[in-house]
Amino acid sequence: MFLRQSTSQVIRFGPALDKDDGVTEETSLTLAQGDMRLSKDGGAFAQKNASGNATHDSDGWYSTTLNTTDTDTCGILKLNVHQPANMLPIWETFYVVEETVYDAMFAASAKMDVNVKNINDQVITGDGGSGTEFQGA
């Protein structure tokens, strides 16, 4: 899942499964801020910055909010949720991308910037107008 850099957003994770049988969905856990740990772009794990518990949705799936501090670093964002006394660990991977990249992919008026400046390591010159040939510099 892609996340927009430096943007507060709700994420989903799960299913939370019972630690004893590994099958039964845990639907009534109180997953606190300290139970949810993040690693930003390969950094050390630390509890998520956004306060608040996770909320159960259905079938062991939970949601929580990440704030702008949680999503301020581009790259892979790993989420680990674990309560050793109650559930098996959950691991989720998110990809934090710059705002312009996210908007180009998912905004209602999404348009990729396709301006070409180099081809085969050659700088493109010329304006592309009628009768103008593009030349490698």
Segments (PLM) and residue ranges:
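Polar, enzyme-active/binding microenvironments
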Residues: 1-137
